[in-house]
Amino acid sequence: MQAKTTSEEYVIPNFAQTINNRTIVNIFESCKYRSPLIICALNDAVLAKEYSNSMAMGSGTITFMIDNDVDIMSSLYTTFRTVSTLLLMGNQLCVFIVVPMSVISTDALTAIAYAYRGAMIELRHYGRGDDYVQERLESLFKLSPLCGTPHMGPKYYGPTVFSELLDLSHHNKTSWYSVIDYSMFTRTALVGFASYMMKTLSLNSSIVNIVGYNPPYVWAAMMHGVTIRYIEKEIPNPKGKGPMGLIMPELNGRVLTNKVKYVLHNPQIKLLCLDSMMFMSSRNIVYIGAYPATHLLDMNLRGWNIYAVDPEITQQWISDMKAKTGANICASSRKFMFDVSENIKINEFFGNQPYSIIDDSWVPDNYEQFQDKKRNYFQELVKSDQKVTLITMKWNTRKNVTCEKLLALLPQPYGGKLYEMRAFFHRNGIGSITIDANSVEKYIQKFQELPLGAQVGTQKFMHTMISRVQDVMSIQPKKGDVIIASYSLSNASNPKKKVLEYLTKASKSEAMIIFGAPNLERVKYMRERGVLPGNNITINGEKITFNNPSGKKWTDFGYTNSELLACDMIEVTIEQMVSFMSTSFRGTGYYSNSIYNDLFSWFIPIWVWNQTMQIQDIRLSPVALVKCFTTKIRNLCYVPHSTYYALRGHLVAKMFSENNIENNCYSISGKSNETFTVLKDFKFPTSIGVLEFKAGEKVNISGHLLSLAVAAHFVAVPVTMWARHIKYMTVDRQKPPDVDRILFFDNKIKRNTLEKWHTKSEVILAALIAGEYVGLMLNNFHSKAIVDDLCNTVLATFR
């Protein structure tokens, strides 16, 4: 087939020469490492140039440098348009930014890095010649092509314990760990996004409801200043004593054998799990034995009130804790008396609002007597009319003890070899119970014999105290409710029709709900191509069954974009969420992605999009998707740049011919900035109306749409959002006053006017040829269902 471009003719290569099923599988595999970008901002251009050369020569890193001597917007555009073509090529990419913060803020640069799934290194707080900058760049050079900074997030809690790593490698689980790694990122991103939107939309809620249990949500909530509640259909019986079975629950029961595996928190911080759960129980915390509480310094505790007591407390400690956590703190360096006099001060500080107590106090002498005094005080407190939500205290006693209102007696997930448990008192605790010292000793010994993963898994017992046992779909969603239903509602135990009805109700009631599910057509395509995502997958109709290497098996319903759109839900990728938050995201990043995670898509209500995301800047742009897949295929097939664009012109001409449009009405240009020129007026009928073309008009069909149709076979593509954005930009628009101008570097912007992208006709024509275009690009190894779903969504948007 041929297409005339200028005075020469270019033969369109036969994609069958190189594109076969193995090629498709290789593209899937390359998606695992499609985050090779690092943005490094510093003040020293000489040093940046030196390490740019060293990394390029030493590891094949493709480097770029932007300094303050160039037009910043233009330089950002050319640099990152280049980056977008290279994201699947396998080379590390590093962009050195030597521009003052007054020109490009850390927030803007972080948003750009995350938009391209990159890592952000900010060194502009250090002056030229600072030793730390030299050390950091030397580390970057030595680690290349790896990166010592996680992608898409500032934190990382991977398998840091040697025994854990050894266990993974012995059981052939290391490849599956990238799935867990990325899942941890996903869960913390969802909590961060919910928190960000709660503030942005001024929602009258401080609670995020989590459908489906997984431990990292608690830590993520602490990092983003929100409170969570789990909503579970059922919770396995812990088989201990007490009303919830949490007084010394079984250590070999279904709770632990079915434990959720996840990336560990820092195992050196034994109080992190306990304190995180207690901070979820109340926004008012009495912390007895608070000093030093270093594990809290990294948390976002704005909105929490802490009444801290410890003889070691200093004014400096109070200042640091307030400054770093944002909490409102009342601190006392005297001993806590464990008597009624304390209650008056506590109630005054909390304004007579409910509160929880964390006790981590200890004395060197008469410790048994000290424990008796605390225990008696706490059990009387929960029996009184005081507004006490929950109390936890150390349990080190080595004698038989009878107590009241005990709700739970649990091991400490990171307790190590300590002879110590945690008691929890609550108004609904058991009336009276005698705890046998010998039984406690045997229980602790059994706990210490468990592998680390199982020990950490016991925090599930604690989390049942912040869980609600109910089918979320039986709860009427209300305006302002915040719900995360990812990896949960899509489970096959939830009828698909019922889930779609619930999502419709939630969206229409203006609840802020985030829904995640496998994309049915993408899963089917992956299976047809024989791709192995690290676990076995079988498909039966709309049901998808997963088997992971550890033997866990689960079945989900697959969903499509069209189904969710009918529920007033719009797709947003996790990367868009994180880029939109920028530096407000304080969760975990990752080092490699997984094919398994790319099977999922996430959706938010359209009303949220309408209020916050109606105009596209780099944070919401699909720019990291539109170039890299087609560029990789073009390089595999040695397709010249001019030939690639000639193909588009050829397909448009073919379509016009099939629809009886005379060829003297237009002239095919087949260039990157012009598909054809209109020679005389003509009309072209389509399923959504008649397109009119005027003589002299230069038409450039949407390449973004065509590229997205290819990318949608491999990764989540937010086509509905993109279609709405491009429809909005069929005319010039004013830049939103509250959005940094830098974030529009990928737009054409003059003063504060954003120039239009494409006409309606240019988008519709691209949608109409997309099926044949993708078929040629992938040599008919494509999914008609994926392309049809994408194009029908675009056409419906412009209808």
Swiss-Prot record:
It comes from the Viruses. The keyword Nucleotidyltransferase applies. It catalyses: a 5'-end diphospho-ribonucleoside in mRNA + GTP + H(+) = a 5'-end (5'-triphosphoguanosine)-ribonucleoside in mRNA + diphosphate. GO terms for biological process: 7-methylguanosine mRNA capping. It is found in: Virion; Host cytoplasm. Its main location: virion. InterPro entries: P5_Phytoreov. It comes from Rice gall dwarf virus (RGDV). Pathway: mRNA processing; mRNA capping. The keyword Chaperone does not apply. Its EC number is 2.7.7.50. Belongs to the phytoreovirus protein P5 family. Keywords: GTP-binding, Host cytoplasm, mRNA capping, mRNA processing, Nucleotide-binding, Nucleotidyltransferase, RNA-binding, Transferase, Virion. One of its GO terms (molecular function) is RNA binding. GO terms for cellular component: host cell cytoplasm; virion component. Enzyme involved in mRNA capping (Potential). Binds to GTP and might have guanylyltransferase activity. Together with the RNA-directed RNA polymerase P1 and protein P7, forms an transcriptional complex positioned near the channels situated at each of the five-fold vertices of the core. This is Putative mRNA-capping enzyme P5.
